[in-house]
Amino acid sequence: MELTLKDAKGALEVSEATFGREFNEALVHQVVVAYAAGARQGTKAQKTRSEVAGGGKKPWRQKGTGRARAGTIRSPIWRSGGATFAAKPQNHSQKVNKKMYRGAIKSILSELIRQERLIVVEKFGVDEPKTKQLAAKLKEMDLNDVLIVTKEVDENLFLASRNLHKVDVRDVQGIDPVSLIAFEKVLMTADAVKQLEEVLS
């Protein structure tokens, strides 16, 4: 199959297996959820009765006071005591094998092409790290909510994009399922498309 180049005459020959597959909604959902779960910190924590400071001394003797027996002032039923079932840091990550991950990326790319949300250009960049320069270029192309993907990290392009809302710049190694579906349009250079095809094959 061929992808039309927006900034030049001609087209780019790409693999049907990578850019022309059917959209697998269940797979994409599973991979996106797993990716988001892996980004969770899971640092919630509370203290049990053994972890709360103090409470080493028995508050009163075992027998003879008429009161209920007590061994520590940090018992969960006491004010300032530890939690009965204290929350602990958790690992929320889910296992996704490489085949599933690559399949989801291919599925998303194919759907972006069908929805005409993937734009391929021969080259894309700015001469200097100026936001105004990049903003003007994107306005020319009628793009304001876009993920820009290049073959390698372009320092000027990255710095120019940092102050633009809804614009992100990644290299091929930096893309993920969440970023691909988060933007209205995805702008890719021809070099990036070929490298991505190589990585996914």
UniProtKB/Swiss-Prot annotation:
Keyword DNA repair: no
Entry keyword set: Ribonucleoprotein, Ribosomal protein, RNA-binding, rRNA-binding
InterPro entries: Ribosomal_uL4, Ribosomal_uL4-like, Ribosomal_uL4_dom_sf
Keyword Ribosomal protein in annotation: yes
GO BP term, example: translation
NCBIfam families attached to this UniProt entry: rplD_bact (TIGR03953)
Family according to the record: Belongs to the universal ribosomal protein uL4 family.
HAMAP family assigned to the protein according to its UniProt record, in alphabetical order: Ribosomal_uL4_B
Function: One of the primary rRNA binding proteins, this protein initially binds near the 5'-end of the 23S rRNA. It is important during the early stages of 50S assembly. It makes multiple contacts with different domains of the 23S rRNA in the assembled 50S subunit and ribosome. Forms part of the polypeptide exit tunnel.
Protein name: Large ribosomal subunit protein uL4
